[in-house]
Curated annotation (Swiss-Prot):
EC number: 3.4.21.92
PANTHER family assigned to the protein according to its UniProt record, in alphabetical order: ATP-DEPENDENT CLP PROTEASE PROTEOLYTIC SUBUNIT
Known function: Cleaves peptides in various proteins in a process that requires ATP hydrolysis. Has a chymotrypsin-like activity. Plays a major role in the degradation of misfolded proteins.
Gene label: clpP
Protein name: ATP-dependent Clp protease proteolytic subunit
Length: 194
């Protein structure tokens, strides 16, 4: 992946930043890849850094992700709930699967979608191999993750748990407006407010 750089002119001369470092300077985190342990560790570190810098100032988390590993996503989710700084979430493009959970977990009143963004929720999935005992253990873990993620979505959307369970049984796609009506976001925005 090519990472763009920006050159900033200051009174002391020029400063070169990779684009993600420059965005971080403005308290912006961009989650634009599938979520795995490595990606989660970077996002968690950025959240902790920005919270330590100023726990009263908003952190903006922009999301364009197909989702990914449940444990990695839960590390981001838990950190968002742990930090004192309010974390706003903005979906651009797509927030699917675990990324949809992260979107919904933003500070209430600060969860946004751009007009043509999509959100997709579903139950966790996984493939297993091994002995019958190992397969049984993995099946139990997936069922536990399914229950937990449905409870998290119900908590943040205000939807009844039974509805979330039904809706996540298969891939459930929502437009930005439908995500608003579902309670996954609080507003569809067309322009960033100053």
């Amino acid at each position: 992946m090519v990472i763009p750089y920006v050159i900033e002119q200051t009174a002391r001369g020029e400063r070169v930043y990779d684009i993600y470092s420059r965005l971080l300077k403005d308290r912006i985190i961009f989650l634009g890849t599938p979520i795995d342990a490595q990606v989660a560790n970077v996002v968690v570190a950025q959240l902790l850094f920005l919270d330590a810098q100023n726990p009263n100032q908003e952190i903006k988390l922009y999301i364009n992700s197909p989702g990914g590993e449940v444990d990695a996503g839960l590390a981001i989710y838990d950190t968002m709930q742990f930090v004192r700084a309010p974390v706003s979430t903005i979906v651009i493009g797509m927030a699917a699967s675990m990324a949809a959970v992260i979107l919904a977990a933003g500070e209430k009143g600060r969860r946004y979608a751009l007009p043509h963004a999509k959100v997709m929720i579903h139950q966790p999935w996984g493939g297993v191999r091994g002995t019958a005992s190992d397969i049984a253990i993995q099946a139990q873990e997936i069922l536990k993750a399914k229950k937990l993620l449905n409870e998290i979505l119900a908590k943040h959307t205000g939807q009844p748990l039974e509805k979330v369970e039904k809706d996540t049984d298969r891939d459930y796609y929502l437009s930005a407006q439908e995500a608003l009506e579902y309670g996954l976001i609080d507003q569809v925005v067309t322009r960033e407010e100053a």
